[in-house]
Amino acid sequence: MESYNSQSINIDDVEPSVNLGGFAFIMLAAFLGALTAALFLPNWQPSLTQSVSGADPKAFWYLSRGSAFSAYFLLWLSMLLGTGITNKLSVLWPGLPPTIELHQFTSIIGLAFGLFHGMILMGDHYINFSLAQVLLPFATSGYKPVAVGLGQVGFYTMLIITISFYMRKKIGPKTWRSIHFVSFLTYILVLIHGLLAGTDTSAIGAQLFYLITGGLLFFMILYRILVSRANAREKKMKLQAIPPKPPTS
């Protein structure tokens, strides 16, 4: 990761903590790793997949559930760090430079877990997704197609947001910031996906997990809005306090 020596940082000048090649490698590794496991692991190590639940292997389902919670948590953490950057709370702790880098890094790793979460389901005998059904939103017809589709759309919007960071100099900071606001929609889509498609949603632990993370993020977003409005009012008052220049003859 790149280090910064000053808390006074222009966000528009920050370089990616992971270069484009590294980002592509991480995503490719998640894609190929899940694809290989889903397609070839049952033939290579049948005892491994059957050991979880006997004759009807659910190892892939458990892997998908675990990676789903990991992807959601990393997306949530990235959002939380992002709100801390904009409302300046990160200056207090852990500091603006590490917060910016963690914000970027958690987004990328969260995307990788999200990709793995979908791809590994190709090995599950109950859902039996094809590659096209995993990659194309709302292409499934068996298991909760709407809820699954919302998660797929959330993944692609997060992917677009992440890629836009690498194209920021080409598209301009204004366009990039507009795209970045889609991250709030992304979180909502992923949260709904988890609540409706997750088999653990009825568990108290999962409900508390979603409630605490969602509530904390909502508080941070609300705080960000209030701080932005207060700063705008303060700036307006300062401009109004400046005496007008005398007319020149």
Where is each model-derived feature located?
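Membrane-embedded alpha-helical bundles that constitute the cytochrome b-like, heme-associated redox core
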Residues: 1-249
